[in-house]
Amino acid sequence: MAKLKLIKIDGSFETEPVKLSPGLIAKELKQQPVFDAVLVEQASWRQGTHSILTKGEVRGGGKKPYKQKHTGKARQGSTRNPHFVGGGIVFGPKPNRNYSLKLNKKAHTAALHTVWSEKLASDNTHLVDQNLFNKTEGKTKVMMQFLKSAKLLDKNVLFVVNTLNTNLEQSTSNIKNVQVKHLDKVSVRDLMLANALLVEKEVLKALEGKFK
């Protein structure tokens, strides 16, 4: 049975580890939903505001470049034609394209369950509580000292909480490699990018309800 230890403000651990409910660890790790979930998230970032100039939108070229006959060249009516350098683009991208993809709820839950299972079984995942958050007093200096004591300074740290704490948010806001996320806002990609995961104890109960 998987176990997690509660980490304290001085970087040490509680002696008694917390046993995880069997339902938190997926019986089967499904990688395809994980891939799909990350793809959907990244696709949602695309704004679709790209825009090229068509032949009718390129400035200039209103005058015929040279006379119709007796030049030995093919006849041309405008330098805005697509085959001229600086001319309009044919069938290029225009704004308001929707790049978003869809993933059904069951597949998204399977993706989260798979990634959470891998993280909860990892040695880089620990438990935290509101007591630790309050002891930071909202100070970056105290949080930095905690990360140093816990040997997490050089890692991408993700705090996952069930209740947002002002002291925690303030103490981590100026630290580049530290993120604080509410459980409902954590994505598959967030979990995968985290080298160290610090999970509030109450999150475990919420996850049991989500994955049962």
From Swiss-Prot:
Q: Does the keyword Ribonucleoprotein apply?
A: yes
The molecular function GO annotations come to: rRNA binding; structural constituent of ribosome
Q: Which UniProt keywords apply?
A: Antibiotic resistance, Ribonucleoprotein, Ribosomal protein, RNA-binding, rRNA-binding
Effect the entry attributes to changing H70L:
After 32, 37 and 48 antibiotic passages; confers resistance to various antibiotics in combination with a 23S rRNA mutation and up to 3 mutations in protein L22
Query: Where is region (Disordered) located?
Result: 55-86
Biased composition, Basic residues: where in the chain?
61-73
Q: Please verify whether the record's keywords include Kinase.
A: no
What is the top-level taxon of the source organism?
Answer: Bacteria
Question: Which GO biological process categories is it annotated with?
Answer: response to antibiotic; translation
| Cited Pfam families | Ribosomal_L4
Per the record, GO CC terms?
ribonucleoprotein complex; ribosome
Effect the entry attributes to changing H70R: After 30 clindamycin passages; confers resistance to clindamycin and josamycin
NCBIfam families per UniProt:
rplD_bact (TIGR03953)
The record describes its quaternary structure and partners as: Part of the 50S ribosomal subunit.
Function in brief: One of the primary rRNA binding proteins, this protein initially binds near the 5'-end of the 23S rRNA. It is important during the early stages of 50S assembly. It makes multiple contacts with different domains of the 23S rRNA in the assembled 50S subunit and ribosome. Forms part of the polypeptide exit tunnel.
Q: Give the protein family.
A: Belongs to the universal ribosomal protein uL4 family.
* Name this protein carries in UniProt: Large ribosomal subunit protein uL4
Q: State the organism named in the record.
A: Mycoplasma pneumoniae (strain ATCC 29342 / M129 / Subtype 1)
Lineage here is: Bacteria, Bacillati, Mycoplasmatota, Mycoplasmoidales, Mycoplasmoidaceae
Whichever gene encodes this chain, its name is: rplD
